[in-house]
């Protein structure tokens, strides 16, 4: 039986570029070589597509160690230097010419998780892993996600949405609007970034200007959100028409909240699978996750995050990630493993779910 040719697409123009490479490396190691021929396609920070040669070299880097021992900026410079020294011609994006039959997407964040690459691949009639255009775009925007799931009867944290232009036009007015709505502490978040990039927990007025400046420098829209107390609970959802929900996992942050450095550099958070909440609450979380998955029109996969306060009995949806991380410390593959899907089985299932969506 001939092997199916898979384009493993990674890198990209987002601030999560390096995490995307680490995810792709994990996926490459777990796709069956007997059933699939993997062609790595690397997108540089500047948006240039590179195939095979340099793409494979970058895939083999130990970026996890580089991030731990230096900084995201140093890692980005090292990658750009590799590309420059390779002097490889860009890939011409003719997927059919090299026999690509399906794409495995490990692009995190802007330009990869927000519906843009999905729309491009739909135009090329190339099936791909994960959600389609609409669900990808919708879940990328934290403000729109809240509106959609709240309409389905799912609890979300109280929030307001601001435009960066409003902040730059009248900073004091924005400060006043926020303080009229919330008591400290609260969160300031870019609306369209992942991996907790640009998120600040603001404990007092002196921290507010820097938090807003940081978020506004990264996105044209920001979300200011009430700080919810409770355990951080995550579930993985896998499937198209008949999705399955994993066991619940729990994250105990090593810092004030589970931010980028806690996730990928310090690695100080503690993970618990199953989560340390009563069985009946786990069942309710899983039920709400499935409801959200369907309300948002998801397919393929998503990781859905909650805040759970067992004393009050409250379950609040935090966010939905349509291309979750596949690194060694990522919750999605761990949750699926705890639910009976080994990493190779998970990679196989995701590719099969992608192929199911192929239109004649």
Swiss-Prot record:
Cell compartment(s), UniProt: Cytoplasm
Biological process per Gene Ontology, one example term: regulation of cell shape
SUPFAM superfamilies: Glutathione synthetase ATP-binding domain-like, PreATP-grasp domain
PROSITE patterns: ATP_GRASP, DALA_DALA_LIGASE_1, DALA_DALA_LIGASE_2
Binding-site residues, Mg(2+) 2: 319, 321
GO cellular component: cytosol
Superkingdom classification of source: Bacteria
Residues that bind ATP: 179-234
EC number per UniProt: 6.3.2.4
Residue intervals of the ATP-grasp domain: 146-352
Co-factor remark: Binds 2 magnesium or manganese ions per subunit.
Pathway membership: Cell wall biogenesis; peptidoglycan biosynthesis
Cofactor field: Mg(2+); Mn(2+)
Residues holding Mg(2+) 1: 305, 319
Presence of keyword Cell wall biogenesis/degradation: yes
UniProt keyword annotations, A-Z: ATP-binding, Cell shape, Cell wall biogenesis/degradation, Cytoplasm, Ligase, Magnesium, Manganese, Metal-binding, Nucleotide-binding, Peptidoglycan synthesis
Substrates-to-products reaction catalysed: 2 D-alanine + ATP = D-alanyl-D-alanine + ADP + phosphate + H(+)
GO molecular function ontology, one term from the record: ATP binding
The keyword ATP-binding is annotated on this UniProt entry: yes
Function: Cell wall formation.
Family: Belongs to the D-alanine--D-alanine ligase family.
Name of the protein in question: D-alanine--D-alanine ligase
Organism: Pelodictyon phaeoclathratiforme (strain DSM 5477 / BU-1)
């Amino acid at each position: 039986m001939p092997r199916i040719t898979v384009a493993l697409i990674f890198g990209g123009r987002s601030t999560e570029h390096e995490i995307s490479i680490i995810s792709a490396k994990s996926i490459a190691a777990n796709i069956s070589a007997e059933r699939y021929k993997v062609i790595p396609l690397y997108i540089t920070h500047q948006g240039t597509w590179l195939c095979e040669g340099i793409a494979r070299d970058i895939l083999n880097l130990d970026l996890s160690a580089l991030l731990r021992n230096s900084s995201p900026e140093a890692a980005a410079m090292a990658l750009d230097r590799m590309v420059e020294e390779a002097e490889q011609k860009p890939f011409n994006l003719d997927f059919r010419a090299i026999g690509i039959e399906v794409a495995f997407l490990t692009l995190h964040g802007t330009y990869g998780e927000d519906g843009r690459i999905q729309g491009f691949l739909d135009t090329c009639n190339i099936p791909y892993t994960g959600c389609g255009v609409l669900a990808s775009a919708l879940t990328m925007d934290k403000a729109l996600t809240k509106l959609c799931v709240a309409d389905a009867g799912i609890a979300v944290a109280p929030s307001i949405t601001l435009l960066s232009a409003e902040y730059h036009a009248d900073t004091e007015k924005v400060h006043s609007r926020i303080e009229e709505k919330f008591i400290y502490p609260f969160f300031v978040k870019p609306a369209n970034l992942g991996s907790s990039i640009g998120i600040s927990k603001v404990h007092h007025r002196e921290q507010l200007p820097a938090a807003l400046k940081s978020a506004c420098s990264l996105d044209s829209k920001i979300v200011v959100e009430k700080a919810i107390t409770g355990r951080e609970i995550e579930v993985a959802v896998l499937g198209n028409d008949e999705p399955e929900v994993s066991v619940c996992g729990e994250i105990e942050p090593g810092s004030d909240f589970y931010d980028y450095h806690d996730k990928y550099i310090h690695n100080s958070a503690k993970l618990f699978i199953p989560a340390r909440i009563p069985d009946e609450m786990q069942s309710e979380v899983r039920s709400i996750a499935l409801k959200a998955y369907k309300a948002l029109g998801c397919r393929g996969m998503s990781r859905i995050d909650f805040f759970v306060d067992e004393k009050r009995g409250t379950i609040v949806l935090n966010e939905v990630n349509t291309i979750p991380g596949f690194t060694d410390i990522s919750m999605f593959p761990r949750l699926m493993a705890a639910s009976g899907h080994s990493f190779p089985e998970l990679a196989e299932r995701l590719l099969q779910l992608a192929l199911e969506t192929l239109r004649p």
